[in-house]
UniProtKB/Swiss-Prot annotation:
Cellular component GO terms held in the UniProt record: nucleus
Organism ancestry: Eukaryota, Metazoa, Chordata, Craniata, Vertebrata
Protein name as catalogued: Zinc finger Y-chromosomal protein 2
Comment on protein domains: The binding of ZFY to DNA is mediated by the interaction of the GGCC core base pairs with zinc fingers 12 and 13.
Protein purpose: Probable transcriptional activator. Binds to the consensus sequence 5'-AGGCCY-3'.
Source organism, top-level taxon: Eukaryota
Similarity section: Belongs to the krueppel C2H2-type zinc-finger protein family. ZFX/ZFY subfamily.
Composition skew (Basic residues), residue ranges: 373-382
Organism: Mus musculus (Mouse)
GO molecular function ontology, one term from the record: zinc ion binding
Subcellular location: Nucleus
Zinc finger (C2H2-type): 403-425, 434-456, 491-514, 520-542, 548-571, 577-599, 605-628, 634-656, 662-685, 691-713, 719-742, 748-770
Underlying gene: Zfy2
Sequence motif Nuclear localization signal, residues: 372-382
């Protein structure tokens, strides 16, 4: 049997538990487990109580003074009225003290703490159960330890300082360690998971239990924890140590403001609560609370330090910069038992209790407040790179956040400026993951290194060239050398003055410059055509299709015109007869004559001016107008083109409406085709151009045109370089030109080769490329 366990005889059990009631006690063979809460007795008389026994044992109330803990309510046989209340009252859930000198001693029963109180009868709400007794004696009471099984509570505990709901009974025997519920049934038979729960709260006191009485003005109570922290469950992953305060001196009125500061004693186990008028000596009580999840230790627990005056500063400070000193314990964080003992206003008690509970609240450890943590539905974003920051507080209270550089200590207002600064540090460049094997290039991205290596491959290809002996041109292949040594053919654009020596460059020029006039592009070679029929003929070159065959030989062609040319050149002697209407050829004269009769029979409309016949009147009319009429009475107003009939003029005018007309600046010529306009200017106005603009090199036929053009330049501001003929309209470009070309002052010098640079970033890049090994050494 442990030294903390005692064995009671049947007579002692009967005398001990008769006052509690048979229904509240469950006897298990020879042992019984009882959890005895701290009981505080108040008396306003000067009567000394020794070995007191209650006159009415059925009305005994065992009350706990520790906040947020379930208490034991022993059902009484009857309830007393408020009129029966005498001077001796037991106040539940409050820490009270003697207003006058009291000597309290219990035989074999140790009272851990007795605190002072200034609660008056006017501001006190009386509980439901009140004990009236002139002399209370308790004898033959064994030594018990207070054990708080917080893990057995499956719901959130809500405690009112003055009106607590006394409904549940949790009784435990230190000897048997069996837990009973309100009905007397052991809880371990109900649910093994509840007993094996890791979350519990264990309180340990500092010094051996003793009661000191030093006159009528002070009552000091010191106790020792007989439960060592080493007795905790070995499987517990984490133990959180929480410090609370206890008072051991008598103060009738502490005041409205209580400040707790660290005592300057050598032992370091006591804190001192000071006020302008009083001083209270407060020993510490250590409470160990088990945290069920050790993986939660990486998460930060928000701690708010300070009272109402410091609230603004704590709110302005970021969470990761708020620190808490154990020595700075404010009055707002006093336990509710203390606040109840020194304050008459219960509303202020609740406010201070809420603040105090926030210190003991730990979501991850599963402590007293069992509020289920809601799972966030938001997806976790990838953590960005964190940068250290510092806050400067001005004398007027304003704060300024800056971001210092980890290499040189230079401070910046924003993260963007800090990032740009760090990228130019040699230390940062040396820590890059990927380095080029050909040069000093380094990067943290693999794709960037891949793109950089591709540039090296292109450089290697361009270096493998052959120089032509005639024109000193670098050629990549030997075959190109033979082609280049051939005839220097010049390819000219038929729409403008562009000239090139390669056909591919000319095709590229046509696609880029004259693409609008060539909407039909070949998918194989990129050549453009104006009409889809021309593209269709061109595609046959790539496919090899030759639909046109010669009837005299095996010749095939992709174009009908090529076939006709072939027949005329190769088979002219074999075709003596040819129809003049349908261009059919015949080898026999009779066949040709029979074919001509067919044309004569079909044409019944004879022309009056010639022997022409038509199959219908419309064809005959068209023949007369086009052949025998030289006048064009219907002319276009835009281009002065003439037509024989008004219908033809109407169709022609529609083409002008759908197209934009381009006016020649030298004459009245207009054309919907810009290429025709360019051809007109080159042919009609480029022979003699006496007037030329000195700024834009534009040419004019007349001097008035040049003067009008010069006005457009005068309205724009031109920046002329004083060292050279460079001029520009861009101010930033002009400044960049002067600095880069005409400025010899290079403020940023290399420490190794004394080479100058205009910007620090250029100097750092130079060091990493040419002095990397020296810089790292």
């Amino acid at each position: 049997m442990d030294e903390d366990e005692i064995e009671l005889t049947p007579e002692e059990e009967k005398s001990l538990f008769d006052g509690i009631g048979a229904d509240a006690v469950h006897m298990d063979s020879d042992q019984i487990s009882v959890e005895v809460q701290e009981t505080v007795f108040l008396s306003n008389s000067d009567v000394t109580v020794h070995n007191f026994v209650p006159d009415d044992p059925d009305s005994v109330i065992i009350q706990d003074v520790i906040e947020n803990v379930l208490i034991e309510d022993v059902h009484c046989s009857h309830i007393l009225e408020e009129t029966d209340i005498s001077d001796n009252v037991i106040i539940p859930e409050q820490v009270l003290d003697l207003d006058t000198a009291e000597e309290v001693s219990l035989a074999q029963f140790l009272i851990p703490d007795i605190l002072t109180s200034s609660i008056t009868s006017t501001s006190l709400t009386m509980p439901e159960h009140v004990l009236m007794s002139e002399a209370i004696h308790v004898s033959n009471v064994g030594h018990f330890e207070q054990v708080i099984h917080d893990s057995l509570v499956e719901r959130e505990i809500i405690t009112d300082p003055l009106t607590a709901d006394i409904s549940d009974i949790l009784v435990a025997d230190w000897a048997s360690e069996a837990v009973l519920d309100s009905s007397g049934m052991p809880l371990e038979q109900q649910d093994d998971a509840r007993i094996n729960c890791e979350d519990y709260l264990m309180m340990s006191l500092d010094e051996p239990s003793k009661t000191d009485h030093e006159g009528s003005s002070e009552v000091t109570m010191n106790a020792e924890s007989e439960t060592d922290s080493s007795k905790l469950d070995e499987a517990s992953p984490e133990v959180i140590k929480v410090c609370i305060l206890k008072a051991d001196s008598e103060v009738d009125d502490v005041g409205e403001t209580i400040q707790a500061v660290e005592s300057e004693t050598d032992n370091g186990n006591e804190a001192e609560v000071t006020d302008q008028r009083t001083s209270i000596h407060v020993p510490r009580v250590n409470i160990y609370m088990l945290a069920s999840d050790s993986q939660k230790e990486e998460e930060d627990t928000k701690v708010i330090v300070g009272d109402e005056d410091a609230g603004g500063t704590a709110a302005d400070t970021p969470e990761h910069e708020q620190q808490m000193d154990v020595s700075e314990i404010k009055a707002a964080f006093l336990p509710i038992a203390w606040t109840a003992a020194y304050d008459n206003n219960s509303d202020e008690i609740e406010v201070q209790n809420a603040t105090a509970s926030a210190m003991l609240h730990h979501d991850e450890s599963g402590g007293l407040d069992r509020v289920p943590k809601q799972k966030s539905k938001k997806k976790k974003r990838p953590e960005s790179k964190q940068y250290q920051s510092a806050i400067f507080v001005a004398p007027d209270g304003q704060t300024l956040r800056v971001y210092p550089c980890m290499f040189c200590g230079k401070k910046f207002k924003t993260k963007r400026f800090l990032k740009r600064h760090i990228k130019n540090h040699p230390e940062y460049l040396a820590n890059k993951k990927y380095h080029c094997t050909e040069c000093d290039y380094s990067t943290n991205k693999k794709i960037s290194l891949h793109n950089h290596m591709e540039s090296h491959k292109l450089t290697i290809k361009t270096e493998k060239t052959t120089e032509c002996d005639d024109c000193r041109k670098n050629l990549s292949h030997a075959g190109t050398m033979h082609t280049e040594k051939g005839v220097n053919k010049t390819c000219k654009c038929k729409f403008c003055d562009y000239e090139t020596a390669e056909q591919t460059l000319l095709n590229h020029h046509l696609l880029v410059v004259h693409r609008k006039k060539f909407p039909h592009i070949c998918g194989e070679c990129g050549k453009g055509f104006r009409h889809p029929s021309a593209l269709k003929k061109h595609i046959r070159v790539h496919t090899g299709e030759k639909p046109y065959e010669c009837q005299y030989c095996e010749y095939k062609s992709a174009d009908s015109s090529n076939l006709k040319t072939h027949i005329k050149s190769k088979h002219s002697k074999e075709i003596p007869l040819k129809c003049g209407i349908c261009l059919l050829t015949f080898s026999d004269t009779k066949e040709a004559q029979q074919h001509a009769v067919l044309h004569q029979e079909s044409r019944t409309h004879q022309c009056s001016h010639c022997n022409h016949k038509s199959s219908n009147s419309s064809d005959l009319k068209r023949h007369i107008i086009s052949v025998h009429t030289k006048a064009y009475p219907h002319k276009c107003d835009m281009c002065s083109k003439g037509f024989h009939r008004p219908s033809e003029l109407k169709k022609h005018v529609a083409t002008h409406k759908s197209k934009k007309m381009h006016q020649c600046r030298h004459c009245d010529f207009k054309s919907p085709d810009p290429f025709l306009l360019s051809h007109h200017i080159l042919s009609a106005h480029t022979k003699n151009v006496p007037f030329k603009c000195k700024r834009c090199k534009k040419e004019f036929q007349q001097q008035c045109e040049l003067q009008t053009h010069m006005k457009t330049h005068s309205s724009r501001k031109v920046y002329q370089c004083e060292y050279c003929e460079y001029s520009t309209k861009d101010a930033s470009g002009f400044k960049r030109h002067v600095i880069s070309i005409h400025t010899k002052d290079y403020p940023h010098r290399c420490d190794f080769c004394k080479k100058g640079f205009r910007r620090p970033s250029e100097k750092n890049q130079h060091i990493m490329r040419h002095h990397k090994e020296v810089g790292l050494a």
